[in-house]
């Protein structure tokens, strides 16, 4: 996360308060964006009013230097707007809302490692992997998409009040027989997330890094997460998915969850067998602000916004 601090705001609060706020940002490894004048003001405030721990922290802090890549993909927060909620914003872990966290979280937490040698975004995925390993990004079990908007509302009005949109990414299955249909069963969820219903929503509302409505979320382009595992991985577990391959709607939109022998608890095992090449072989490509990326890369960049 990048915290933007203006000189006017830095000067408007006590030096002790400024020292405490900046030390908190530094301690959790976030970036501080400011001009040179403001940086000197912050450093002097910590030097003159901060504790020895805060002063020592400032001496080793590297977060004033922010790459263009970080500015492009990390979330930027204006401290003046979130001054009263900074502690909550910094200290509470970010959450990934998952339909079945018990089995699917193994997949999501392994993706940054699987993509660690990614040529386009390896620095961003390294930050993401580090955050997950440190439990700064954790799973939130949704129990099915029907409960999502209620769970999001609840968190947004209680423990994560005023900051949850920046601390959560919701992910769920498409659950349709093709790539052009959006399920009316998800109308309440779609409307909550972006103000549109199934008949109005477009790919550009979903497969982007700047989503309308303020929430960060992702709906799998294929029918469900199961459709991203290739046939041979299922065969390794003794599950024959030939019927999916020969179906009218094709492998990507067949309900693999109903195939005889398949169980949801196989997802962690399937995930452990996947390589980057396995995921990229038949994945959808998107053009995001002139940059071509795969759906998995896009999903991981949505997770990066939580770092």
Describe the predicted segments one by one.
Residues 12, 145-149, 220-228:
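A short acidic, often aromatic-flanked loop/helix-cap motif at beta-alpha or helix-coil junctions
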Residues 44, 110, 150-153, 191, ...:
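Charged/polar, solvent-exposed surface patches and flexible loops
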Residues 104, 225-226, 296:
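Short runs of predominantly hydrophobic/aromatic residues within well-ordered alpha helices
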Residues 271-307:
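Hydrophobic, glycine-enriched assembly/anchoring segments
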Residues 1-53, 300, 307:
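Non-catalytic accessory regions outside enzyme or core folds
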Residues 37, 42-176:
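RecA-like P-loop NTPase motor core
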Residues 171-279:
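Activity-critical C-terminal alpha-helical subdomain
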């Amino acid at each position: 996360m990048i915290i933007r601090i203006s000189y006017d705001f830095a000067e408007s609060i006590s030096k002790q308060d400024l020292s405490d706020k900046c030390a908190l940002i530094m301690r959790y490894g976030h970036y501080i964006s400011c001009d040179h004048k403001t940086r000197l003001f912050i450093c002097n405030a910590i030097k003159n009013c901060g504790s020895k721990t805060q002063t020592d922290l400032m001496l080793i802090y590297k977060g004033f230097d922010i790459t263009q890549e970080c500015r492009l993909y990390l979330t930027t927060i204006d401290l003046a707007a979130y001054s009263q909620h900074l502690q909550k914003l910094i200290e509470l872990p970010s959450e990934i809302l998952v339909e079945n966290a018990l089995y699917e979280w193994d997949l999501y937490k392994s993706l940054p490692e699987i993509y660690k040698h990614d040529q386009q975004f390896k620095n961003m995925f390294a930050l993401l992997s580090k955050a997950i390993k440190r439990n700064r990004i954790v799973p939130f079990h949704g129990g099915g998409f029907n409960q999502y908007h209620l769970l999001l509302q609840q968190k947004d009005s209680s423990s994560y009040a005023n900051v949850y949109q920046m601390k959560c990414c919701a992910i769920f299955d498409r659950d349709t027989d093709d790539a052009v249909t959006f399920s009316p069963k998800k109308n309440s969820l779609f409307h909550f997330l972006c103000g549109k219903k199934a008949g109005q929503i477009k790919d550009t509302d979903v497969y982007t890094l700047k989503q309308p409505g303020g929430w960060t979320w992702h709906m799998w382009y294929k029918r469900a997460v199961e459709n991203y595992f290739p046939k041979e991985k299922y065969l390794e577990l003794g599950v024959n998915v030939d019927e999916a391959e020969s179906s009218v709607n094709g492998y990507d939109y067949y309900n693999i969850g109903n195939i005889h022998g398949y169980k949801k608890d196989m997802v962690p095992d399937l995930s452990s067998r996947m390589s980057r090449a396995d995921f990229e072989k038949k994945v959808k490509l998107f053009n995001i602000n002139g940059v071509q990326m795969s759906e998995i890369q896009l999903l991981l960049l949505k997770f990066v916004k939580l770092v």
